[in-house]
Amino acid sequence: MNINDALTGVSRLFLDTAPVIYFVERNPHFVDLVDPIFERLEANITAVVSPITLSECLVGAIRLGLTDLEQAFVDVLEQDEVVFVDIDASIARDAARIRVRYNLQLPDALQVATALTAGCEAFLTNDTALKRVTELRILVVGELVV
């Protein structure tokens, strides 16, 4: 699917972990696909993330002792233009239902529940298992074209 078509009608986009890692670490396989999306985030789409996105992004940098990379993730995800949605009891209950309905791992179900609570129309990921979810437009990075 073409990136512009994929983002048509999207005003709030949930960012799963992988696309953020591709963007910050400049992954050569995916950076040409995520850059245009992140440019749109600065212009006319609101990015939404959860504590799971932030903590999963930080794991590799912390494990390797790369404080500059750790800070780069924090800088991207904690900027004023990014909506950071905390996971509360209501989201946890929704995640349990989503996990059962779609047979997802709990972190994925929490991410989807957070996106729905935040009013996102689309969810950017590279996890094809999430394509089972029907309440959101699931955008798989590896299936997008510029």
Label each region the model flagged.
Residues 46, 83, 137-139:
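Conserved beta-strand segments of alpha/beta enzyme cores
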Residues 1, 112-146:
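Acidic, metal-binding active-site segment of PIN/NYN-like and related structure-specific nucleases
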Residues 2-4, 82-124:
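Active-site neighborhoods of divalent-metal-dependent phosphate/nucleic-acid chemistry enzymes
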